[in-house]
């Protein structure tokens, strides 16, 4: 037998993660519950969510800015937004687009008012409360495809300024779809 063998570790139960977060990190029950659900049995991911410098917070800010500027049809500031995003490294840009797809899905699921379907932090949910009504059956697939296509272009070494500005302009059109 080979010495390099795969060993599967079982996920930690969400209740155990929640309990550990309350005991070891002194979190309140609601926050611990949210983080445990998002982590899905991964203690390292739970600790990552606690980190205030978490990359997801920056991605959330960029997502909020994109959606607000697109809703206001502010082309000039969308151009600036795309230039800022273009300064990120390619891998970070791809992670950001993955995060955008996550927020899109969570915003759509928020419309169903089923908390067990939602995997959002408190900050994400605070934004989704008002934003979710703009994501519906008429536009979710097209916006998701747009983010996926943009990620593909970035991976293929396309000019990020052009990719992100084009994406931002298309989001304007897709957000107004009912």
Show the residue positions of the predicted features.
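Charged, glycine-rich active-site and insertion segments that engage polyanionic ligands
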Residues: 1-99, 103, 110-117, 122-178
């Amino acid at each position: 037998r080979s010495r390099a063998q795969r060993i599967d570790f079982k996920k930690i139960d969400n209740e155990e993660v929640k309990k550990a977060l309350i005991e070891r990190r002194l979190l309140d029950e609601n926050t611990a519950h949210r983080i445990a659900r998002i982590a899905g049995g991964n203690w390292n991911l739970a600790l990552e969510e606690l980190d205030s410098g978490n990359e997801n917070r920056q991605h959330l800010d960029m997502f909020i800015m994109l959606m607000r500027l697109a809703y206001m049809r502010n082309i000039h500031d969308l151009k600036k937004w795309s230039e800022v995003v273009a300064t990120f490294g390619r891998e970070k840009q791809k992670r950001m687009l993955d995060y955008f797809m996550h927020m899109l899905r969570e915003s759509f699921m928020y419309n169903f008012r089923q908390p067990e379907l939602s995997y959002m932090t408190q900050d994400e949910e605070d934004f989704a409360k008002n934003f979710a009504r703009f994501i519906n059956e008429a536009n979710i697939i097209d916006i998701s495809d747009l983010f996926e296509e943009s990620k593909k272009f970035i991976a293929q070494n396309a000019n990020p300024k052009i990719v992100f500005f084009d994406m931002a302009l298309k989001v304007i059109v897709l957000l107004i779809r009912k």
